């Protein structure tokens, strides 16, 4: 782990070896590469009714656009990390760029639900890869903090920006906002580390089994008996495969690293808590304060922005802290937020609670990612980032479902 907030991480850029040891990709390029992913997650919330109206469909039908993006980032995160690990940064970047560009063209030019779903999925696959690449190329706590802060900050403002794009251009333009990440590709390519020598052969069986497991887990909150059974079956087969292929798509060195498992599990919990709070808060505020949907949206924006922006400084400030310290700090912040929300339904208290859970999730994502990458052997950094981000994204998927179940 780094000795200061500006010192390089040991494994963050692995497996690529830096062409010039003292230089890396500027953090601003990495933040621009990663941040627009959040447009695909949160951006459609205010423009889906317009899409449903123009397409002559129900709101439930057009939500498949968002579902496709969520599924794609879940499976794309480990798949694109595997591509980076085996083929290097350049090929992974160009593949992700092609997917994002194709997806943007589909959602902008073909106003039909199948095209919109395919385009959203393509953008999800590409931006998932961009985010994993960005996090694996960070070289200090400050750069990791900037990357994760960009994800949180864009996510907090995405609904309003997408709605504005819909008013000025079209709702299809709002769905194409993840393509803004393409602006960072030339800069990252120019400063990228040298591509690695070829590693172990690609493991197609491991990739298929992990994709099946992730797909099942994504649908557990929506159809838990079937999806849960499928997840157990896929997980069992993947575990058996891991025993016979230790250097496969999911390296044994990662799943046997205690710090990696701890930080990934905590990232899941922080994401589930934060996104569960985001799901519950609008109804609580509307009921307690009698606010309109617009007033609720404007009120929630500020604690979410606070969490995203403040996380940059928190990650830098905790760069030298031991794993045990951050493992207690960020879950403690999230627990404090949940406790406040349970103790009082005052709008001010609820917004403070959201600010705490947002800060915990955004800061924890960056701080835990750095420690997860440093906990695995050389050559496994990019794969570790893919698996770590997968845990965080699964938490984001489970959080609202858990919150809905608790709410009755």
PLM region descriptions:
Residues 1-23:
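Intrinsic disorder in cytosolic terminal tails and internal cytosolic loops
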Residues 22-52, 59, 65-69, 73-84, ...:
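12-transmembrane solute porter fold
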Residues 90-95, 141-153, 199-208, 254-260, ...:
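Cytoplasmic-side transmembrane-helix entry/capping segments in multi-pass membrane proteins
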Residues 105-109, 186-191, 238-239, 339-343:
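Membrane-embedded alpha-helical segments of multi-pass transporters/permeases
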Residues 109-114, 220-228, 343-348:
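Transmembrane helix interruption/hinge and helix-loop junction motifs
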Residues 119-151:
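Cytoplasmic helix-loop-helix junction between adjacent transmembrane helices
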Residues 149, 153-169, 394-406:
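A gly/Pro-rich, aromatic-decorated transmembrane alpha-helix motif that marks the paired
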Residues 156, 163-265:
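Hydrophobic transmembrane-helix bundles of small-molecule transporters
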């Amino acid at each position: 782990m780094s000795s200061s907030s500006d010192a390089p991480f040991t494994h963050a850029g692995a497996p690529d070896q830096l062409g010039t040891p003292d230089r890396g990709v500027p953090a601003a390029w990495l933040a621009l590469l990663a941040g627009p992913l959040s447009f695909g997650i949160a951006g459609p919330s205010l423009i889906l009714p317009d899409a449903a109206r123009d397409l002559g469909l129900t709101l439930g039908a057009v939500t498949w656009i968002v579902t496709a993006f969520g599924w794609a980032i879940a499976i794309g995160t480990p798949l694109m990390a595997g591509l980076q690990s085996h083929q290097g940064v350049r090929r992974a970047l160009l593949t992700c760029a092609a997917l994002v560009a194709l997806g943007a063209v589909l959602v902008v030019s073909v106003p039909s639900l199948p095209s919109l779903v395919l385009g959203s999925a393509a953008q999800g696959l590409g931006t998932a890869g961009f985010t994993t690449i960005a996090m694996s190329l960070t070289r200090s706590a400050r750069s990791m903090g900037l990357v994760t802060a960009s994800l949180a900050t864009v996510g907090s403002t995405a609904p309003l920006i997408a709605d504005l794009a819909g008013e000025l251009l079209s709702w299809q333009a709002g769905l194409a906002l993840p393509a803004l990440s393409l602006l960072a590709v030339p800069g990252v390519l120019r400063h990228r580390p040298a591509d690695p020598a070829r590693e172990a052969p690609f493991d197609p069986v491991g990739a298929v089994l992990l994709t099946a497991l992730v797909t099942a887990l994504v649908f557990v909150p929506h159809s838990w008996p079937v999806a849960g059974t499928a997840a157990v079956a896929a997980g069992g087969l993947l575990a058996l495969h891991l025993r016979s292929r230790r250097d496969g798509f999911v390296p044994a060195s990662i799943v046997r690293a205690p710090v990696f498992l701890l930080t990934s599990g905590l990232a899941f919990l922080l994401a589930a808590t934060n996104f569960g709070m985001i799901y519950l808060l609008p109804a609580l505020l509307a009921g307690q304060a009698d606010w309109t949907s617009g007033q609720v949206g404007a009120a929630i924006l500020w604690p979410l922005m606070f969490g995203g922006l403040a996380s940059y400084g928190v990650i830098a400030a905790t760069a030298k802290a031991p794993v045990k310290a951050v493992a207690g700090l960020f879950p403690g912040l999230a627990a404090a937020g949940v406790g406040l929300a349970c103790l009082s339904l005052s709008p001010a208290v609820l917004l403070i609670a959201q600010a705490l859970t947002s800060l915990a999730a955004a800061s924890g994502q960056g701080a835990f990612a750095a420690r997860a990458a440093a906990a695995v052997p050389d050559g496994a950094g990019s794969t570790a980032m893919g698996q770590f981000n997968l845990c965080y994204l699964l938490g984001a998927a489970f959080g609202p479902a858990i919150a809905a179940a608790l709410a009755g």
